UniProtKB/Swiss-Prot annotation:
Entry keyword ATP-binding: yes
SUPFAM superfamilies tied to this protein: Nucleotidylyl transferase
Residue numbers binding (R)-pantoate: Q61, Q155
NCBIfam families xref list: cyt_tran_rel (TIGR00125), panC (TIGR00018)
PANTHER family for the chain: CYTIDYLATE KINASE/PANTOATE-BETA-ALANINE LIGASE, PANTOATE--BETA-ALANINE LIGASE
Miscellaneous field: The reaction proceeds by a bi uni uni bi ping pong mechanism.
Subcellular location: Cytoplasm
Record HAMAP family: PanC (MF_00158)
Residue numbers binding ATP: 30-37, 149-152, 186-189
GO biological process: pantothenate biosynthetic process
Pathway(s) served: Cofactor biosynthesis; (R)-pantothenate biosynthesis; (R)-pantothenate from (R)-pantoate and beta-alanine: step 1/1
Annotated organism of origin: Pseudoalteromonas translucida (strain TAC 125)
Catalytic activity: (R)-pantoate + beta-alanine + ATP = (R)-pantothenate + AMP + diphosphate + H(+)
Name under which the protein is recorded: Pantothenate synthetase
Length: 282
């Protein structure tokens, strides 16, 4: 596995692969890798001849009161895990490499509509940061495929929309959420939770499942389902940020004409913000 930090070295290797007619898959990450990330790498290996994993804690997608400085950084451990999976390149640029003129002077990518609401409403500027850094990575790696986890479902749809709107020739692939035995979605932020909090956090998946079962049984009173779910989360000790039933592909509010839904949820457990979702087809 090659460990690359500089753009020139990355581009040189990408050019050689392209000249050899090899296909490339990209897995963008912020590090602190877990089994969910490794499942993305496994999917990438199935799709392409060569796999590039980027590890970059992107300051542009963190808000003023968010945990950029405290975000877990486990680079040595991450590299060992990626080497075990026979990843071809791990790209670990510095902030100065990605944003040489600083954030204030950086051009950015905004994806309208689909980036608003849900996490976009709770974290203003977040998806601008995500879309900008992913666009830069797409330009640098020029992948045929890019793998993202479905746990961050709005992010996945934002990136699909961005790639389509900007005519970027990449197939954006969503990979199913990896879960703990308890049902809790794997996340780098789970490391902030105590064992007791992890037990409480399982309520998020349970409430999502209950709502999904109601939809499958024909209940289309979306507003009541959402309100009941929020109350259930509160009773379990979580503070709901949002709980919404949406059209799966557009993320607009669900209507009676829809049959493909995604239930999107975010809730706080102490200071830790958890997100999860379930896709439902009826």
């Amino acid at each position: 596995m090659q460990s690359i930090t500089e753009i020139k070295s990355l581009r040189s290797q990408i050019k050689a692969w392209r000249q050899a007619g090899l296909s490339i898959a990209l897995v963008p990450t912020m590090g602190n890798l877990h089994l969910g990330h490794f499942s993305l790498v496994e999917k990438a290996k199935m799709m392409a001849d060569k796999v590039v994993v980027s590890i970059f804690v992107n300051p542009m997608q963190f808000g003023a009161n968010e945990d950029l400085d405290n975000y877990p950084r486990t680079l040595d451990e991450d590299k060992r895990g990626l080497a075990d999976l026979e990843t071809d390149i791990v790209f670990t640029p510095s902030v100065e490499t990605i944003y040489p003129n600083g954030l204030a002077a950086q051009s950015f990518v905004d994806v309208p509509d689909i980036s608003l609401g849900y996490c976009g409403g709770s974290r203003p500027g977040h998806f601008r940061g995500v879309a900008t850094v992913v666009t830069k990575l797409f330009n640098l790696v020029q992948p045929d495929y890019a793998c993202f986890g479905e746990k961050d479902f709005q992010q996945l749809q934002v990136i699909k929309t961005m790639a389509r709107d900007l005519s970027i020739p990449v197939e954006v692939i969503g990979v199913s959420t990896m879960r703990e035995v308890s049902g809790l979605a794997m996340s780098s932020r789970n490391g902030y939770l105590s064992n007791e909090q992890k037990d409480s956090a399982t309520a998020l998946f349970k409430v999502l499942n209950n709502c999904a079962e109601q939809l499958k049984s024909g209940n289309t009173d979306f507003a009541t389902l959402e309100e009941t779910a929020k109350q259930s989360l509160q009773q379990a000790g979580l503070k709901p940020d949002y709980f919404s039933i949406a059209q799966r592909d557009t993320l607009k509010a669900a209507t009676l004409d829809d049959n493909k839904f995604v239930i999107l949820a975010a809730a706080y457990l102490g200071s830790v913000r958890l997100i999860d979702n379930l896709q439902v087809e009826v």
